[in-house]
Swiss-Prot record:
<comment type="function">
    <text>Involved in olefin biosynthesis. Catalyzes a non-decarboxylative head-to-head Claisen condensation of two acyl-CoA molecules, generating an (R)-2-alkyl-3-oxoalkanoate. Is active with fatty acyl-CoA substrates that ranged from C(8) to C(16) in length, and is the most active with palmitoyl-CoA and myristoyl-CoA.</text>
</comment>
<dbReference type="Pfam" id="PF08545">
    <property type="entry name" value="ACP_syn_III"/>
</dbReference>
<protein>
    <recommendedName>
        <fullName>Acyl-CoA:acyl-CoA alkyltransferase</fullName>
        <ecNumber>2.3.3.20</ecNumber>
    </recommendedName>
</protein>
<keyword id="KW-0963">Cytoplasm</keyword>
<keyword id="KW-0808">Transferase</keyword>
<feature type="binding site">
    <location>
        <position position="56"/>
    </location>
    <ligand>
        <name>Mn(2+)</name>
    </ligand>
</feature>
<feature type="binding site">
    <location>
        <position position="18"/>
    </location>
    <ligand>
        <name>Mn(2+)</name>
    </ligand>
</feature>
<keyword id="KW-0464">Manganese</keyword>
<dbReference type="InterPro" id="IPR013747">
    <property type="entry name" value="ACP_syn_III_C"/>
</dbReference>
<dbReference type="GO" id="GO:0006633">
    <property type="term" value="P:fatty acid biosynthetic process"/>
</dbReference>
<dbReference type="GO" id="GO:0005737">
    <property type="term" value="C:cytoplasm"/>
</dbReference>
<dbReference type="Pfam" id="PF08541">
    <property type="entry name" value="ACP_syn_III_C"/>
</dbReference>
<dbReference type="InterPro" id="IPR013751">
    <property type="entry name" value="ACP_syn_III_N"/>
</dbReference>
<comment type="subunit">
    <text>Homodimer. Weakly associates with the OleBCD complex.</text>
</comment>
<feature type="active site" description="Proton acceptor">
    <location>
        <position position="97"/>
    </location>
</feature>
<dbReference type="GO" id="GO:0046872">
    <property type="term" value="F:metal ion binding"/>
</dbReference>
<keyword id="KW-0479">Metal-binding</keyword>
C-alpha cells in the first residue's frame, strides 16, 4: 500500500554494550571442531561475522526497546502523551503475556488513549509495524505512532554453546544450530506522524509484500534454540525477494540506478552478496553492519537507517529502499524519501 500523508518524525538506535568476537566463540568450539573435522571458520570466513553485541545479563527486550524509544522521542521533539499507537516488533519478548509493548508503554508512561500491541513476524516485523502504523496515520485515526524493537540474544548464546560443546553433539546438530551464533543484540525505535504535523520530515511511501509460506520450516526458533537450513533459506529467500522486487518496480516505480540507498536486512555476507548481485545494486549504496553486530533480527533495518542518518549519509530528497525478509517466508520492500 502507498501512503500520501505519513512521515518519520524521529529515529534512534541503541548498540548493546558488550562485544563477543567470533574468535572467542571459535576458541570455545575448538574441541568440537577437532572432533568433527571442521577446519573452516564458518562464522568469520564464510558468514563474514567477526563480532556481535550482547546486553548485560539482566536486560530484557522491553528494557532495550524503552531505551531506544526515549531516544527516538527526543529526536522527534514530542512528548509521550502525543503517541496514539505503540507497536513492539521484536522476536525477543519478556513474557508470553502481557505483551512486550504494554511493558514498554508502562515504562514510558503513555496516555490511556494509546493503543499498544506486539507484532511478530520474524525479521520482517519492524517493517510490518511501520505499515500498520502508517495505515492508521493515513486514515487520521492517530497523529503519532511509535514502533519499537529490542532484541536480546544472551540466552540463546549461552544455551547453544552448551549444546555445541557437548561431547556427543553430532555434525548435523552442530550445523543446524550454527546460525544461532550469528545473532546479535540491539534496539531501534521510530516515531511516525501525519505529514502535515512534521512537513520537513522524511516521507514514508509504503511498499509491497509477498510470501512463500510453504517454506515455514526452514528456520524455527524459541527462546534458547534456533534450527536453520541456511542453504535452502538463502535459495528460497532470494527467489521470494526477486518476486517482491518485481512488484516494487511496478508499484513504486523503482529503477535500481535511481535509488540512493538500499537498507537491507542484515543476515550475513553471503546473503548480502546474493541480494546485491541478484538486483544489480551498487555495493557502495549498501551499508552493512553484520560484520561487527551480527543479525539483529527485525531491528537491523531501522538500525542501519538510523546509523546512516547519524553518519550524515542521507540528504534531502534521497530515495531509500527498505528491503526486509523474515523466516516463514515473508518479504517486504518499501521506500522512504528523505
Amino acid at each position: 500500500m502507498l501512503f500520501q500523508n505519513v512521515s518519520i518524525a524521529g529515529l534512534a538506535h541503541i548498540d548493546a554494550p558488550h562485544t563477543l568476537t567470533s574468535k572467542e566463540i571459535n576458541e570455545r568450539l575448538q574441541p568440537t571442531y577437532d572432533r568433527l573435522g571442521i577446519k573452516t571458520d564458518v562464522l568469520g570466513d564464510v558468514a563474514g561475522i567477526h563480532a556481535r553485541r550482547l546486553w548485560d545479563q539482566d536486560v530484557q527486550a522491553s528494557d532495550a526497546a524503552t531505551q531506544a524509544a526515549r531516544k527516538a522521542l527526543i529526536d522527534a521533539n514530542i512528548g509521550i502523551e502525543k503517541i496514539g499507537l505503540l507497536i513492539n516488533t521484536s522476536v525477543s519478548r519478556d513474557y508470553l503475556e502481557p505483551s512486550t509493548a504494554s511493558i514498554v508503554s508502562g515504562n514510558l508512561g503513555v496516555s490511556d488513549h494509546c493503543m499498544t500491541f506486539d507484532v511478530a513476524n520474524a525479521c520482517l516485523a519492524f517493517i510490518n509495524g511501520m505499515d500498520i502504523a502508517a495505515r492508521m496515520l493515513e486514515r487520521g485515526e492517530i497523529d503519532y505512532a511509535l514502533v519499537v524493537d529490542g532484541e536480546t540474544a544472551n540466552l540463546v548464546y549461552e544455551k547453544t554453546l552448551e549444546r555445541m560443546t557437548s561431547p556427543d553433539v553430532t555434525e548435523e546438530e552442530f550445523r543446524n544450530e550454527l546460525a544461532a551464533l550469528t545473532l546479535g543484540c540491539g534496539a531501534a525505535a521510530m516515531v511516525m506522524a501525519r505529514s502535515e504535523l512534521v512537513p520537513d520530515a522524511p516521507r514514508y511511501k509504503g511498499g509491497v509484500t509477498r510470501s512463500a509460506t510453504e517454506w515455514n520450516k526452514l528456520c524455527r526458533g524459541n527462546l534458547d534454540r534456533m534450527v536453520t537450513d541456511t542453504r535452502l533459506l538463502l535459495i528460497e529467500g532470494i527467489k521470494l525477494a526477486q518476486k517482491t522486487f518485481v512488484a516494487a518496480k511496478q508499484v513504486l516505480g523503482w529503477a535500481v540506478e535511481e535509488l540512493d540507498q538500499f537498507v537491507i536486512h542484515q543476515v550475513s555476507r553471503p546473503h548480502t552478496a546474493a541480494f546485491v548481485k541478484s538486483f544489480g545494486i551498487d555495493p557502495a549504496k549498501v551499508m552493512t553492519i553484520f560484520g561487527e553486530h551480527g543479525n539483529i533480527g527485525p531491528a537491523s533495518v531501522p538500525i542501519v537507517l538510523s546509523k546512516l542518518k547519524e553518519l550524515g549519509r542521507l540528504k534531502k530528497g534521497d530515495r531509500i529502499a527498505l528491503l526486509g525478509i523474515g523466516s516463514g517466508l515473508n518479504c517486504s520492500m518499501a521506500e522512504v524519501v528523505w
